[in-house]
Amino acid sequence: MKGLHLHGVSHAFNGNRVLDNISLTVPAGELVCLLGPSGCGKTTLLRISAGLEELQEGQVTIDETVMAGPGRHVPPERRKIGLMFQDYALFPHLSILANVTFGLSNPKSKETRYRAMEMLEQVNMASHAEKHPHMLSGGQQQRVALARVL
């Protein structure tokens, strides 16, 4: 089945187990929100799914392709997973458009820039493409972060 699948994911920091045998399936096209108390492992699970954190135990598959497991780690840029954290993590020295294209395989290509502008249009931020993050309100910065995820 297409989608994100986590199988038996466990993770520890300095011997403190924060994830213990977690299994989760998110069908393709679904939007998911993880809820739980501070420190319960939500962000760690997301970081493992996206490839930002090395998997210690278990397996992560996307569209039936193993992304992480014993002896395998596909880098984040090849996983096609977008995350939006509380801190929007916009780069202050980059324009809004450059923030949206950052990390993509060919950020300066016409196609990438066109697609990024489409995403900025979806969140009503295309007119701010050449501005820098400090010139935007918090809500506007959040919409830029959403465009980057999309």
What are these regions (language model features)?
Residues H73, H132-L136, Q140-Q142:
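Conserved ABC ATPase signature
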Residues T65-A68, K108-H128:
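Conserved ABC ATPase "signature" region
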Residues Q59-R79:
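ABC ATPase NBD Q-loop/coupling interface
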